Amino acid sequence: MPVVDTIAAIATAPGSGGIGVVRISGPSSRLIAEAVLGHCPPPRHAAYLAFRDAHALLIDRGIAIYYPGPHSYTGEDVLELQAHGGPALMQILLKRCLELGARQAEPGEFTRRAYLNDKLDLAQAEAVADVINAATEAAARSAVRSLSGEFSARIHSLQQKLVDLRLYVEACLDFPEEDIDFISQGRVAEKLAEVTAGLEAVFREARQGNLLREGLQVVLVGQPNVGKSSLMNQLAGEEVAIVTPIAGTTRDTIKNSIQINGITLHITDTAGLRETNDEVEQHGIARTWRALENAGVALLLVDAAHGIGKVEKSILARLPQFLPKIWIHNKIDLESTPPKIEEQDGETHIHLSARTGDGVHLLRQRLLDIAGWQPSGEGVFMARSRHLLALNKVRDHLEVAAGRLMQAELFAEELRLAQDALSTITGEFTSDDLLGEIFSRFCIGK
């Protein structure tokens, strides 16, 4: 359905600033320019002009830039008015544009129009919001990579490999008289392996990009008085949790976010797990288990002097099997033993002192490893949870396809489903409901 109306919004953040921008997009942009400025400035040239109201009274003087479509952000005629950034002045200028026939833009509507006009694909459109909301330098750089199209290019490369494989398989189905035994030739299995390897590489980078965006949820769990709050304070670099020798001091979950090499860690300190008749403490313990349901990694603390006992094993048994876990043997300062990290039966054990900080660097590095952190950060692009879900769905269809190599029609159908799932990332195959959900989370003016 073609867009026939013109939208306007304040594109800069709320509050006072040196410069404020009102953005207009749509067929009436040129007429609004003529009414506010007296004439439409030359395309893509910054012009210093007077902005006037309906009575020709001066609103402000500033910079006006006119971008005729399709060579604009939205693909439509776009006008940007840059004035002094006072909130009242911005509202006067926006009101003037609305009087001239524009309507107030909805959140994300400018970027949505850019997507609908093929100026951006969906992954790039989402990256616009991610660039704005990036909390770290690493997150900002990865979001810019997505906005520039690096993520989309990787997805399109995978799509092309899938298309090539589908064409080959379906040609064999459509022309059986040619008697091409593509299965015995091994070419299909080889091509499928190439697609799967490419998918895994993209998934690893997307997962790190997602961690840059969302952060890693780290939950500290263990019996009372094993040093969970001390470890949280050590990781945070400040006292965010109360520490006393009294068991059961922490009765509720305490949350704090820190950054290690650009990765945000959302750390949750929890109530010690034990049998208790204290109603308040019981509520805290219930919250501990709820926090673990959303954890990205669990730190299981034990007293280094006592080691892992029945209580710790019972805690371990209740944790999700897929959840990454690290055993923290705390209080090595009391045992006069050095810090160390070791692997035992597929589990990571770190010996440290939360009180002195000795060995905490080993934990920080292990958390970065779990997050998939790469020292260079090269090639990492911003990815959202929906992208990981889509990539997982592609992986599932490819795994099913691998088991149906001798059933050509079923094999071809799994390839089609894999391609459809992959296409949801860039928006070639996406529902209107999903588009509404994505763009509604943008700020107004983008």
Curated annotation (Swiss-Prot):
Listed binding positions for Mg(2+) are: 229, 250
Q: How is the cofactor bound?
A: Binds 1 potassium ion per subunit.
Listed GO molecular functions? GTP binding; GTPase activity; metal ion binding
Q: Name one GO cellular component term.
A: cytosol
Q: Which cofactor does it need?
A: K(+)
Q: Which residues make up the binding site for GTP?
A: 225-230, 244-250, 269-272, 353-355
Task: Name where it's found.
Answer: Cytoplasm
- In this protein, which residues make up the domain named TrmE-type G? 215-372
Residues that hold K(+) according to the record: 225, 244, 246, 249
InterPro entries with a match to the protein in the record: G_TrmE (IPR031168), GTP-bd (IPR006073), GTP-bd_TrmE_N (IPR018948), GTPase_MnmE (IPR004520), MnmE_dom2 (IPR027368), MnmE_helical (IPR025867), P-loop_NTPase (IPR027417), Small_GTP-bd (IPR005225)
Highest taxon above the source species: Bacteria
One of the GO biological process terms = tRNA wobble uridine modification
Q: Which Enzyme Commission number(s) are listed?
A: 3.6.-.-
Name the Gene3D superfamilies for this protein: P-loop containing nucleotide triphosphate hydrolases, Probable tRNA modification gtpase trme, domain 1, tRNA modification GTPase MnmE domain 2
Q: Report the SS bond pairs.
A: none
What are the alphabetically sorted keywords of the record?
Cytoplasm, GTP-binding, Hydrolase, Magnesium, Metal-binding, Nucleotide-binding, Potassium, tRNA processing
| Family (UniProt) | Belongs to the TRAFAC class TrmE-Era-EngA-EngB-Septin-like GTPase superfamily. TrmE GTPase family.
Q: How does it assemble?
A: Homodimer. Heterotetramer of two MnmE and two MnmG subunits.
Physiological role: Exhibits a very high intrinsic GTPase hydrolysis rate. Involved in the addition of a carboxymethylaminomethyl (cmnm) group at the wobble position (U34) of certain tRNAs, forming tRNA-cmnm(5)s(2)U34.
Name recorded for this polypeptide: tRNA modification GTPase MnmE
